[in-house]
Amino acid sequence: MGSRHQVVQQQNRGDVVPGAIKQKSMAVEKKNRRALGDIGNVVTVRGVEGKALPQVSRPITRGFCAQLIANAEAAAAENNKNSLAVNAKGADGALPIKRAVARVPVQKKTVKSKPQEIIEISPDTEKKKAPVLEKEITGEKSLKKKAPTLTSTLTARSKAASVVRTKPKEQIVDIDAADVNNDLAVVEYVEDMYKFYKSAENDSRPHDYMDSQPEINEKMRAILIDWLVQVHYKFELSPETLYLTINIVDRYLASKTTSRRELQLLGMSSMLIASKYEEIWAPEVNDLVCISDGSYSNEQVLRMEKKILGALEWYLTVPTPYVFLVRFIKASLPDSDVEKNMVYFLAELGMMNYATIIMYCPSMIAAAAVYAARCTLNKMPIWNETLRMHTGFSEVQLMDCAKLLIDFHGGSTDQKLQGIYRKYSRLEKGAVALLPQPLLA
């Protein structure tokens, strides 16, 4: 068997006939078929003019094995380079051969996540479509990120709630916290009591009765109330007695026709009833007769007292404006007695005027007196959430009644009825009647 060196020399000299070499090589290949070592589409290396080189058998040494491996790798690399070049150029308008590209299994697994590695048919659009695919993938990812989830929604709501908690509304003061240990304050059900008072205040509220009284007008009533205020102050009676006296007078006039001559008698008997109901030591009948300069006898006073109780059906437990004044003044958190005296001053001016008790309910008169007093004393804020909760009225609802009370304050110095004005001009009342009235828009 000839060596490889001899075979190469014969090819170079050209002594061997090509046909004979071909037949000989085919015969050798039939006898010496080798198992397929590579199932890839690797073309067998051919000799000159596309002729296969004859098989040379020699003992395989380490150096020869390394040379064969190096030659095989070099041939495979050259074939891959040629096939890629053919695909890139697209020779003769033919489609590129996809089988020339050796696909790595890893690339098949990552085709979905990296679409930019896919080889397009047209080489010109390969670089243009890859960024588009990348943008589409990133767009899908961004859409997935923007999709709201339950966790993100709850987180956003919690953040919004925390922002709201950082800016809370005006805090409502617990005005009964200091009276928890006071049994007379009945903190446990004081709110229920005032809810009942507000629901029942219209039942004891007098209607417009002046048209049914032929001998009495609004001015006469104002004179009577002004005189009762002076008598009340002279006897040093409680405020509850004064407000209940006025309520009894109006309710009786709303139910019975009364002559001008009996009007003062009605006031005296009403104060006697209210004193017995509210005071520990009520004034005697002789005291009332004496203060009226003996205009009426004891029998007349007692007889009128009986008539009044019959007309009112002995219904004396009524929510007067004073009942609400106590609660609303407490809700205003006054820092001195000046604010309290101003509230009482404006409330009594309102009770003296007939239009006030007809147009507005007792709770609104009390709330408007508190509002007008805070305006007069420049208390800021004039109306807060604590007052709104306990009174049940907003600032807008109280504006008309408060303006009316402030007008009465401004005109109290000009009119002849000076009983209330003199009472609250004293130093013991803080001289609140001397303060200038505010201007409400």
From Swiss-Prot:
Keywords of this entry? Cell cycle, Cell division, Cyclin, Mitosis
State the superkingdom: Eukaryota
Which segments cross the bilayer?
Answer: none
Key word Disulfide bond present: no
Entry's Gene Ontology molecular function annotations: cyclin-dependent protein serine/threonine kinase regulator activity
Q: InterPro entries, alphabetically? A: Cyclin, Cyclin-like_dom, Cyclin-like_sf, Cyclin_A/B-like, Cyclin_C-dom, Cyclin_N, Cyclins_cyclin-box
GO BP term, pick one: cell division
What family does the Swiss-Prot or TrEMBL record give for this protein? Belongs to the cyclin family. Cyclin AB subfamily.
> Quaternary structure per UniProt?
Interacts with the CDC2 and CDK2 protein kinases to form a serine/threonine kinase holoenzyme complex. The cyclin subunit imparts substrate specificity to the complex.
Role this protein plays: Essential for the control of the cell cycle at the G2/M (mitosis) transition. G2/M cyclins accumulate steadily during G2 and are abruptly destroyed at mitosis.
The protein here is known as G2/mitotic-specific cyclin-2
Q: Per the UniProt entry, what species is this protein from, by scientific name? A: Antirrhinum majus (Garden snapdragon)
